[in-house]
Amino acid sequence: MDKDQIKKELADKSNEILTKYGEPDVVEEVSVMNMSSKTVFLGSLKVFNYEIVPNLIKDLNKQLKGYGELVVRDQRVTPCCSPSYIHISFNVTINN
């Protein structure tokens, strides 16, 4: 398993999906947690248009599920001094 290649592909696919829906956020890097029996790739996206969230999550599931066990979560964030947004996070778990 080439972890650097998977990290790059996950970030690229996430950015393609954000671009498809006209979102300004960019996924610069996907984090990696190495464990003895598995490797977990962690990424997050910031989405300002609430209406596209269900379709964006569907696209994420479709694009990323082939890498391993995929979990996608979303949470509304309301900062004090900037526009509110939906934080979408994903983990892809690959058994070693």
Model features per residue range: what roles?
Residues 7, 18, 27, 53, ...:
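Residues marking helix boundaries in flexible regions
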Residues 40-82:
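Short, hydrophobic/π-rich interface segment
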Residues 13-23, 59-64, 80-81, 86-88:
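Hydrophobic alpha-helical membrane-spanning segments
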Residues 74-96:
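C-terminal edge-of-domain segments
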Residues 1-47:
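An N-terminal amphipathic alpha-helical segment
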